[in-house]
C-alpha cells in the first residue's frame, strides 16, 4: 500500500502514520518505512474510561512515556496543549488474559461483567486528564493524518529504545518475592471475603427449631460470629431441650376467670405464707437455744 492510498476509515478510526528509523532488518528503499496506528474516540459508560482514545496496532514495546512524547510533539506542531494521564489495558504479551485464581476456585470468579475488562490484543486506551485535553489531541490528530498525502516528510519518526538480549532474559526471570507476597495477600483477602459471604448466604437460609431465620443488618457482624458468641457463653446450650414457647392464646387467657382458678390461687398463697411462718418459727427456736434471739433488733 502506498502513502497516497491511506485515508480516514469509515468506522471512525483515524490513520496515524509514523516513520520507522533505519534498521538493517527493514528493506532498503527510497521511501521511508511506515507504521500505521489507528485512533478513535472511546465511548463507554464506565467512568474510569472517560476522556480516552482507543488505539489499535501500537508500535512494538510501546509504553506511557512513548505516548506522552508523541502527544507532546503532536500538540507542539499545531500550537495546542494536551495532557496524558495513563495508558490503560496495554497488555502486549497477553500476561493478564488468564486468571489462575479464577481457575482454581469458583469463589474467585465473578459473575459481574463490569469487574473484568476484555480488550483485543495490541490495543490500549490512552486516557487524558480532562475533556479539553482529549479534544485538543483529537483535533491535532485529524490534521496530522492528512500529512501523508501532501507532506510525507513532516511525519514523525517513532523512536524507541531497542531492547537488548539481557532485557528479554530478565523478562522471563522468576517474579520478585515482594511482588508475589503482595499479589498472594491480595488474592487471599479476596478469597476469604467471598468465602465468608458464601457461608453467610448458606447460613441465612437455615431455619431454626422455632421456625425463625436469623437476619443480620449491614452494620452488624456476620451470622457465624453471632452464633459463636452465643455458644461460647454456654457451650451446653446446643444440647438443651428447648421449652415450648408460650403462644399468644396462652398469654391472653385470664387466670382468674373461673371460681376454681380463684380458689386455687388463694390456696397457693396461703400455703406459701404458712410454709414461710413455719420456717421463721424454726429459725427462732434455734436462735433462742443459742441465746442470740433479740426481737427488738
UniProtKB/Swiss-Prot annotation:
Molecular function terms from GO: rRNA binding
Chief location: nucleus
GO terms of biological process kind: maturation of SSU-rRNA; nucleolar large rRNA transcription by RNA polymerase I; regulation of ribosomal protein gene transcription by RNA polymerase II; ribosomal small subunit assembly; rRNA processing
UniProt keyword annotations, A-Z: Nucleus, Ribosome biogenesis, rRNA processing
InterPro entries membership: RRM_Rrp7, RRP7, RRP7_C
Keyword Nuclease among UniProt keywords: no
Cellular component GO terms, alphabetical: CURI complex; nucleolus; nucleoplasm; nucleus; small-subunit processome; UTP-C complex
Disulphide connectivity of cysteines: none
Similarity-based family: Belongs to the RRP7 family.
Assembly information from the UniProt record: Component of the 90S pre-ribosomal particle.
Note: Present with 2610 molecules/cell in log phase SD medium.
Family matches, as PANTHER family: RIBOSOMAL RNA PROCESSING PROTEIN 7-RELATED, RIBOSOMAL RNA-PROCESSING PROTEIN 7 HOMOLOG A-RELATED
Protein name in the entry: Ribosomal RNA-processing protein 7
Name of the coding gene: RRP7
Amino acid at each position: 500500500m502506498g502513502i497516497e492510498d491511506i485515508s480516514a476509515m469509515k468506522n471512525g478510526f483515524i490513520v496515524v502514520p509514523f516513520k520507522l528509523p533505519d534498521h538493517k532488518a527493514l528493506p532498503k528503499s527510497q521511501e521511508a518505512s511506515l507504521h500505521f496506528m489507528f485512533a478513535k474516540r472511546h465511548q463507554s459508560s464506565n467512568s474510569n474510561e472517560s476522556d480516552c482514545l482507543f488505539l489499535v496496532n501500537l508500535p512494538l514495546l510501546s509504553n506511557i512515556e512513548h505516548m506522552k512524547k508523541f502527544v507532546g510533539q503532536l500538540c507542539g506542531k499545531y500550537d495546542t496543549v494536551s495532557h496524558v494521564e495513563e495508558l490503560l489495558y496495554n497488555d502486549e504479551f497477553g500476561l493478564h488474559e488468564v486468571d489462575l485464581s479464577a481457575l482454581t476456585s469458583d469463589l474467585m470468579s465473578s459473575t459481574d461483567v463490569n469487574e473484568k475488562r476484555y480488550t483485543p490484543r495490541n490495543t490500549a486506551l490512552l486516557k487524558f486528564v480532562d475533556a479539553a485535553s482529549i479534544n485538543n489531541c483529537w483535533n491535532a490528530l485529524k490534521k496530522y493524518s492528512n500529512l501523508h498525502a501532501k507532506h510525507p516528510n513532516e511525519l514523525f519518526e517513532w523512536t524507541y529504545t531497542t531492547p537488548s538480549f539481557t532485557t528479554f532474559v530478565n523478562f522471563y526471570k522468576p517474579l520478585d518475592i515482594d511482588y508475589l507476597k503482595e499479589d498472594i495477600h491480595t488474592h487471599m483477602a479476596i478469597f476469604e471475603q467471598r468465602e465468608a459471604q458464601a457461608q453467610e448466604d448458606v447460613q441465612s437460609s437455615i431455619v431454626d427449631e422455632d421456625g425463625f431465620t436469623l437476619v443480620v443488618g449491614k452494620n452488624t457482624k456476620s451470622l457465624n460470629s453471632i452464633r459463636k458468641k452465643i455458644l461460647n457463653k454456654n457451650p451446653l446450650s446446643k444440647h438443651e431441650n428447648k421449652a415450648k414457647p408460650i403462644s399468644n392464646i396462652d398469654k391472653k387467657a385470664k387466670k382468674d376467670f373461673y371460681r376454681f382458678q380463684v380458689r386455687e390461687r388463694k390456696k397457693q398463697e396461703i400455703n406459701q405464707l404458712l410454709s414461710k411462718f413455719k420456717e421463721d418459727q424454726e429459725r427462732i427456736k434455734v436462735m433462742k437455744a443459742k441465746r442470740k434471739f433479740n426481737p427488738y433488733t
